[in-house]
Amino acid sequence: MNNVLIITGPTASGKSKISIKIAQDNNGVIINCDSKQIYKEIPIITDQPKLNETFIPHKLYGYVSAVKQYSVAEWVNDLKREIYQTFAENKLPIITGGSGMYISSIIYGLSQIPVIDDNIRYQTKQLFNTLGNKEFYSLLIEKDPMAKRLHCNNSYQLLRAYEVIEQTGTSIFRLQEELKRKPLFDNFILCILVPQKQEVYKKINDRFISMINSSVIEEVKNLISLNIPNHFPAMKAHGIPEIIQYLTNKISIEKAIEIAQRNTRHYAKRQYTWFKNQFPNALFYESQDQLLKFISKKFK
């Protein structure tokens, strides 16, 4: 039976590096499951692999325009196409990235929640813009107490939960429990890389400085020139809001760096908790060496 290998973990945990090593040793193809690395206009700030520096096949990187609101369902369709093509070539698909919604769609399947009316989607967004995160979160909790499990700063999930309760009258979490879902693939192996937090935090800080020292400012300038609405997914990539604040003379570059580093560290911290809670049966590895040893035994 063909295996599907999934390598995930917090941002800056070394997923990309170890995936390349695994692909080299096992005739693999790396397939992206990072929801921001899909966008072709922002390769630097999303730390996309430099495909001209490796002979390992990489799929689903930098192939969607930032002007598009690309859905999880669309990604799943693209993923399945790449997986089956990889099987046809007798290669090992290595799904790599840290986007929780993408990983969940593989492990638990896509939600069968009804499509939201455009009018409800628009009204929800307008309400969110008027109230702001905290007041909108409080209103959501009144309508859907089960939404307390959401983080008040995760605007995407707050909007989604509100849209669903408005559309269906039922909590998104209740619907997820009641509507039958199944994994995309029965033969997946889920490995989660969880290095020491301080090691990851240092990499986050260093990586952002490296981006600033490259041409990331110019990259964000070009993104701004596209006049993309702020709520579009690409505009929320880590570091972009802070650099935009700098470019609009609201904060200094030093402050932009400080805030972006802090926000990304906080995101990584939440990822540690989220992965452990969502995927308790996954294989967790603190070091790349531990993971490589497992892979070498599994596929020898």
Curated annotation (Swiss-Prot):
Function: Catalyzes the transfer of a dimethylallyl group onto the adenine at position 37 in tRNAs that read codons beginning with uridine, leading to the formation of N6-(dimethylallyl)adenosine (i(6)A).
Residues at the site labelled Interaction with substrate tRNA: S99, R121
EC number: 2.5.1.75
Database matches in SUPFAM superfamilies: P-loop containing nucleoside triphosphate hydrolases
Positions with a binding annotation for ATP: G9, P10, T11, A12, S13, G14, K15, S16
Annotated binding of substrate, by residue: T11, A12, S13, G14, K15, S16
GO BP field: tRNA modification
Gene encoding the protein: miaA
Reactions mediated catalytically: adenosine(37) in tRNA + dimethylallyl diphosphate = N(6)-dimethylallyladenosine(37) in tRNA + diphosphate
Subunit structure: Monomer.
Keyword annotations of the record: ATP-binding, Magnesium, Nucleotide-binding, Transferase, tRNA processing
Molecular-function GO terms, alphabetical: ATP binding; tRNA dimethylallyltransferase activity
Keyword tRNA processing among record annotations: yes
Protein name in UniProt: tRNA dimethylallyltransferase
Region (Interaction with substrate tRNA) residue spans: 34-37
InterPro entries: Dimethylallyltransferase (IPR039657), IPT (IPR018022), P-loop_NTPase (IPR027417)
HAMAP family per the UniProt record, alphabetical: IPP_trans
